[in-house]
Design a protein with these regions (language model features):
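Conserved catalytic-core segment of nucleotide-activated headgroup transferases in glycan assembly
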Residues: 1-86, 199-202
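Alpha-helical elements of Rossmann-like donor-binding domains used by nucleotide-donor carbohydrate transfer enzymes
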Residues: 7, 57, 168-171, 204, ...
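Generic beta-sheet signal
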Residues: 72, 95, 136-138
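Donor nucleotide-activated moiety binding/catalytic core segment of transferases
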Residues: 75-124
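Catalytic binding pocket for nucleotide-activated donors in carbohydrate/polymer assembly enzymes
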Residues: 88, 121-194
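C-terminal alpha-helical cap of glycosyltransferases
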Residues: 197-211
């Protein structure tokens, strides 16, 4: 059976709190040659964060609000030591830790109360949960220049708060705790565009497999 929210948090961090936010930034630095993303420089390997002081201030705010921010490292991301767990309410996880604890990535996604993403397809998957989304777009222009997007205007497909700095991250957290959800209708609209059929998954799969 799947682990409960409290069981997963206790297994990973020995932590319980009011809210869980998962941050899944796409990679900017990797060992893959020829990747345009490798030219994007970020001080803390996180968009919207200028330095460690901002992370410390954010950690303090999260502690006051009893929120844990779990930053999931992209498998291709380099120059990032997620083993340095120097914060109380900002915690890093990578594939190795999840495997060690026998926790699937989508179990972690499933227990989160909100998701911070950017240009990653995980935000499309998250629409199925109908929970608040934040899009961290601090390097939007340079990412568009170096990597490019599939859609002509990707912002049309981002039904959530647009985040450009640490202050915006705190606003997202505040809205999450006080129940402010201004993008519910936009998420529903995007859900219909991105997920053609969203009902009776098990029955349709069983019918397809002729069970």
């Amino acid at each position: 059976p799947s682990m409960s929210k409290d069981e997963i948090l206790d297994s990973l961090f020995g932590w319980k709190g009011k809210k869980v936010v998962l941050w899944m930034p796409t990679f900017r630095k990797s060992d893959l040659g020829g990747c345009a993303e490798n030219e994007i420089e970020l001080p803390c390997q996180l968009p919207a964060i200028q330095d460690m002081n901002e992370l410390k201030e954010l950690d303090s705010y999260l502690r006051e609000q009893e929120i844990i921010l779990i930053i999931k490292k992209h498998p291709l991301q380099t120059e990032w030591d997620e083993n340095e767990q120097e914060f109380t309410n900002i915690r890093y996880v990578a594939e190795a830790l999840l495997e060690k604890k026998q926790i699937k990535l989508y179990e972690l996604i499933g227990i989160s109360d909100g998701l911070l993403s950017d240009y990653s397809s995980v935000a499309v998957d998250y629409l199925l949960l109908d929970r608040p989304l934040g899009y961290v777009l601090a390097d939007y222009n340079i990412y568009k220049e170096k990597r490019g997007f599939v859609f002509e205007d990707p912002l049309e497909y981002m039904p959530g708060e647009k985040i450009y700095n640490a202050c915006d991250i705190r606003k997202f957290m505040k809205h999450l705790t006080d129940g402010t959800d201004s993008y519910r209708q936009e998420r529903a609209k995007n859900l219909k565009q991105m997920h053609n059929k969203t009902e009776n998954y098990c029955k349709r799969l069983a019918d397809y497999l002729q069970l």
